[in-house]
Curated annotation (Swiss-Prot):
Keywords: NAD, Oxidoreductase. The keyword Ribonucleoprotein does not apply. This is Glycerol-3-phosphate dehydrogenase [NAD(+)] 1. NAD(+) binds at residues 45-50, 133, 157, 190, 316, 345. Its EC number is 1.1.1.8. The active site is at residue 250. Signal peptide: none annotated. Belongs to the NAD-dependent glycerol-3-phosphate dehydrogenase family. One of its GO terms (cellular component) is cytosol. Substrate binds at residues 157, 316-317. It comes from Cyberlindnera jadinii.
Amino acid sequence: MLRIGKLNLSTMSSAQQRLAQVGSHLTAQKQSLAPQRPYKITVIGSGNWGTTIAKVLAENAGLRPHLFQHQVDMWVFEEKINGVNLTEIINTQHENVKYLPGIKLPKNLHAEPSIVKAAEGADLLVFNIPHQFLPGICKQLSKATLKPHVRAISCLKGLEVTPNGCKLLSTYITEHLGVHCGALSGANLAPEVAKEKWSETTVAYRLPNDFQGHGKDIDRYVLRAAFHRPYFHVRVIEDVAGVSLAGALKNVVALGVGFVHGLNWGDNAASAIQRFGLNETIKFAEVFFPGETNQDTFTKESAGVADLITTCSGGRNVRVAKAMAITGKSAVEVERELLNGQSAQGIITSKEVHELLAAKNLTKEFPLFEAIYQIVYGTESIERLPELIEEDE
């Protein structure tokens, strides 16, 4: 007499037997996806986006004890707020009063001032820092004893430019720490996500060559369970290069939108800048990462056109560029006045992109990216932007 669990198949119709078998298979599959022990999550970074992502992860860790350890660690660069350590404030008041004020954080989110202590024992490292700090962060993390099969997700926006080309920051993490790394990017303004206003994002992750198996290693199921919330919907794809490039280059485009807003040129001009920017982003991917990206990532995913639209509708880069246009001040001056110690990533990314294009003699192939660089760092005026990017018939 054949049984599945407590079910007696001999007393069932063929259709009922098939349903029972399928249900049993799905139950076994679900159980196989549960890890042998809960995964530990650590967030590297505690700015407004870093703290927001840590909030999301801690909420899910609290809800899914079969998958994740209850406590999520967040590495915080220690600083004093009215004479009190920021980590102490976060751990006692459950609020990042400097970078995400007014948002209550889960009690299982623990602020840790030691980056080595925060990283050791982690199964998943989530990097969320200004990208120019990554080399120093990796140098510090090289002193930590990381788990043999720790995995990572990069929420960083930028590129590593070398004389020979450019690398994804996820690749930089892998090369310097030996940690397989994916990427997260999407139409996600941190204050809106922190306030639990509905949005979506894209996680890009390919299974590593040394994948240990479901239930033993981080996979798409685990990543979606870690990041997906009712107010923060997640799609997991494999195009790490496309997601990373879209996340980096949209900040350069947003500077252009900020410039035209500062001159009160209107929505038509802002839309034109975004069209140029999307086209140059796709072209950049084709030139520097041939065969590694999927054009659908730029046109159909949250990490692509949706993030471009959102970033160009507000955010740091637009604010900084708009203030530059209105006041005539430099990017450095405006950043210092507006951003409370944070940075507009488009400023440094535009310089990195220019250096790469100049080294490859390709500046004329990317007129918008080059024009924005020349306005920020060179002698060009914002008023000449239409002339600088004008297309031939």
